[in-house]
Amino acid sequence: MAFIGAVLGMAAVVRSGEPSVWQPLAEEIVLFIDEAETRYRVGDARAAQRAVVEAYFGVFEDRKMEAAMRTTIGAKHTYLVEKQFGSMRKAIKSRENPDVVHEIAEGIRQAVRRDAEVLDRASVPAEVFKVNQ
């Protein structure tokens, strides 16, 4: 748990000195993707799929990173990132080689980190994307 706090803390400030909104969120997604990959490598495909679903629905979509990306970076780009989550889940379900799952996982990690930095540099606030405001 201390490790998670340290990772999130390191990503908590954008270069401009403003608090980071999206980079800590990206690191939460990465933790679920890491868990999915680890679970898959030890043979627990069901837990691996659940971790991917949690990364996507529980963090990426529910916490509005997807919406922020769609409006700031673009719908086509966001769709391609979203598609990677589905590809990882499908690769796990179809029992692909762990190296294939790793490649997809690495693509997700790179994409969410890169895009979180873009959102933070653009000073996109999370509050804009909350429902019923």
Describe each region flagged by the PLM.
Residues 17-133:
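Mature extracytoplasmic or organellar-lumen-exposed domains after removal of signal/transit peptides
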Residues 10-15:
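Sec/Tat signal peptide C-region and signal peptidase I cleavage site
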Residues 2-9:
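Bacterial N-terminal signal peptides
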